Amino acid sequence: MENTIIKERLSEELKNSGLTTIEIAKRIGVSPEMITQYRTTKKLPKLDTFAKLCMELDLDANYILGLTKN
């Protein structure tokens, strides 16, 4: 599992969610600035934040982590 793949896939999924940065931030309890950093592949979320993102946005954690191709 490579950080680059995780960052790229998470960024892609956040952009495709149809939600604004502020909406995502409110849903998972982080600042909009943190979501911006995830969207721009500058930073990875902590594990608990990653879990919240996956649950709130119905994301496939296995895909984001590079364990599956789609």
Report the location of each language-model feature.
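A short, Lys/Arg-rich alpha-helix, primarily the initiator
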Residues: 1-19
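Helix-turn-helix/winged-helix DNA-binding modules
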Residues: 2, 16, 42-45, 56
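Short, charged recognition helix plus adjacent turn
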Residues: 12, 37, 55, 65-70
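Helix-turn-helix DNA-binding elements, focusing on the entry/boundary residues of the two helices
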Residues: 21, 32, 47-50
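Short alpha-helical "recognition helix" segments of helix-turn-helix
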Residues: 24-25
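Recognition helix of helix-turn-helix/homeodomain-like DNA-binding domains
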Residues: 29-44
